Amino acid sequence: MPQLDLSWLGLRLETSLPWLLLLLIGASWLLVRVLTQTYIFYRTYQHLCDFPQPPKWNWFLGHLGMITPTEQGLKQVTKLVATYPQGFMTWLGPILPIITLCHPDVIRSVLSASASVALKEVIFYSFLKPWLGDGLLLSDGDKWSCHRRMLTPAFHFNILKPYVKIFNDSTNIMHAKWQDLASGGSARLDMFKNISLMTLDSLQKCVFSFDSNCQEKPSEYISAILELSALVAKRYQQLLLHTDSLYQLTHNGRRFHKACKLVHNFTDAVIQGRRRALPSQHEDDILKAKARSKTLDFIDVLLLTKDEDGKELSDEDIRAEADTFMFEGHDTTASGLSWILYNLARHPEYQERCRQEVRELLRDRESTEIEWDDLAQLPFLTMCIKESLRLHPPVTVISRRCTQDIVLPDGRVIPKGVICIINIFATHHNPTVWPDPEVYDPFRFDPENIKDRSPLAFIPFSAGPRNCIGQTFAMNEMKVALALTLLRFRVLPDDKEPRRKPELILRAEGGLWLRVEPLSTQ
């Protein structure tokens, strides 16, 4: 019988058997892996084929660059949603598929999935990680769930109620500046610049109980936050600088690191100062003292909160949540309020109706301050805010990467691991959901017109388990600022129409410019 001759390998048969067995096992394992990955790829590809695709540039580029962060890109989105009202699939290059959903019936499956199934896809937010850490915006899984439960009391109406006074004060400071600038009859103002400072002023008081007077004089901390936001938006558009090691070598990378350090040092100093005061005061004493001053700030709540096991948040966790609130709370509200004023400037009949509603509310008062109970007494103003958030949502897209297959109501499957975009802008401009979607019509939000509409047709604050925890805070601030603005100023459109610019939030190229006229001069 012929024998296997391995002498040319320098091996004898009896000594080579273990090696042959090991080689066979390794080859079998590799074959199984290859076959498994091939099956997964084939199965994923089959599911992806169920989603319609716009025409590609070519096989290599796919749809890369088809939707740009510009006015033209948003117009392209409105064309796509008119053609594919349920959603569509695109390829970034030859191998990265992205599913975009833009109809309430299909986005429900993703937004209603648990936070452990529909993970936030951080590819669009990863540049914020060195600044915001593992705050609610960027964290996932058990940590996110735990922190969400612990932070929910911070947004209870008992905590939010005293903040209305802060919103009034910060808006008054902004308006005093406007009155000076418009002393000649009117002033042309960049709403983003002015309102961003106002929202940061409010947030610094609500989060830290700190008044930097940033609307009237430069503040290092506030300037650092504005710089960080601008640098992140700029980096997002520079593909070569998406690599951290390369970005750190650039001038902007060094600026980002310096601004990050300044912001962290400020937050850490506040936390450590409050932490040192805690051992000398009982928790009940702190709460009673704060109750007398009628304000419990965000840092207070974070320091006092405990999970189900009585465990407190670490200083690092508190810093991450405070920095996240400062970032998310100023940009989104500034965007929303700026576009609201723009829409009311273009529709003076709605602006005047809002103004009359505010005047009627404050008719018999000596003070023109908006109070907590007033916020529910401004129905038409609220309708105008919501219609502007529909037409110009501050956050235009959110992203998820699911840890398991998600089955849509029509039977199609979003495969595990595929990036899924919930396009808020497209959903809000979907003609099958909103007739004449490009028209600004506040009466869409009349109670009679809301009854038969899906709650997921309007999602400026997202929806489901990962919806915006601060949406009531944001709506309250916008109501106060808008009511006082319309009470004191007439807002007029600029000669030049703004060009929308979707970054982390919806901006306008070169700023959003409007003219304001003090009503006392009319």
Swiss-Prot record:
GO BP annotations listed: arachidonate metabolic process; leukotriene B4 catabolic process; omega-hydroxylase P450 pathway; prostaglandin catabolic process; response to 3-methylcholanthrene
Pfam families: p450
Catalyzed reactions: (5Z,8Z,11Z,14Z)-eicosatetraenoate + reduced [NADPH--hemoprotein reductase] + O2 = 20-hydroxy-(5Z,8Z,11Z,14Z)-eicosatetraenoate + oxidized [NADPH--hemoprotein reductase] + H2O + H(+); leukotriene B4 + reduced [NADPH--hemoprotein reductase] + O2 = 20-hydroxy-leukotriene B4 + oxidized [NADPH--hemoprotein reductase] + H2O + H(+); 6-trans-leukotriene B4 + reduced [NADPH--hemoprotein reductase] + O2 = 20-hydroxy-6-trans-leukotriene B4 + oxidized [NADPH--hemoprotein reductase] + H2O + H(+); prostaglandin A1 + reduced [NADPH--hemoprotein reductase] + O2 = 20-hydroxy prostaglandin A1 + oxidized [NADPH--hemoprotein reductase] + H2O + H(+)
A single GO cellular-component term on record: endoplasmic reticulum membrane
Keywords for the protein's UniProt record, in alphabetical order: Endoplasmic reticulum, Heme, Iron, Membrane, Metal-binding, Microsome, Monooxygenase, Oxidoreductase, Transmembrane, Transmembrane helix
Molecular function (Gene Ontology), one example: leukotriene-B4 20-monooxygenase activity
Organs and tissues of expression: Expressed in hepatocytes. High expression in liver and kidney. Lower expression in brain.
Induction: Up-regulated in hepatocytes by pro-inflammatory cytokine IL6 and down-regulated by anti-inflammatory cytokine IL10.
Spans through the membrane: 15-35, 87-107
Principal location: endoplasmic reticulum
Binding positions (heme): E328, C468
Obligatory cofactor(s): heme
PANTHER family found in the cross-reference section: CYTOCHROME P450 4F3, CYTOCHROME P450 FAMILY 4
Function of the protein: A cytochrome P450 monooxygenase involved in the metabolism of arachidonic acid and its oxygenated derivatives. Mechanistically, uses molecular oxygen inserting one oxygen atom into a substrate, and reducing the second into a water molecule, with two electrons provided by NADPH via cytochrome P450 reductase (CPR; NADPH-ferrihemoprotein reductase). Participates in the conversion of arachidonic acid to omega-hydroxyeicosatetraenoic acid (20-HETE), a signaling molecule acting both as vasoconstrictive and natriuretic with overall effect on arterial blood pressure.
Similarity remark: Belongs to the cytochrome P450 family.
Protein's recorded name: Cytochrome P450 4F4
Organism: Rattus norvegicus
